[in-house]
Amino acid sequence: MIALSPRPTKCNWGTVSFASTLYLGPILDLLIAKVPPDWQAEVRLGLQEALVNAAKHGNQLDPRKTVIVQYAVMANYCTWLITDKGAGFVPQYCCQNDDPNSLLPDEHSENGRGMCILHQIFDQVDWNEEGTQLRLTKNR
């Protein structure tokens, strides 16, 4: 099966790929360089969470495996496609609920908080069918 990720046309996409690492400062700087200044801090936090998950959980911090980020900053939105070489991910929490008590996973859970952070920062948070590519979009 071939999984296609539809991308907007007439869009200038940038791409960065890097070996699995948790040293993300320069990569994050590049990815937020053209993001509106009032968004930069929260977008940086969200992208850091997503990139750490891709490198650590997806690629198991294997330096032979890369994380690929395609990104575009458009007039009315910014979007990032983050792809890892892992076995895939199935989201277990849906943090899109308006009930504040349901936004976070159980206090004893070791996973799920990052997902909630992503849903708070970005307007669209979607995985491809294989669970190896995450699309994050923030609308202006």
Regions found by a protein language model. Give the residues of each.
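Solvent-exposed, flexible loop/coil residues
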Residues: L22, E49, Y93
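Conserved ATP-binding N-box helix of the HATPase_c
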Residues: D38-P63
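Conserved beta-strand-loop-beta-strand hairpin that lines the nucleotide-binding pocket
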Residues: M1-W13, A55-R140
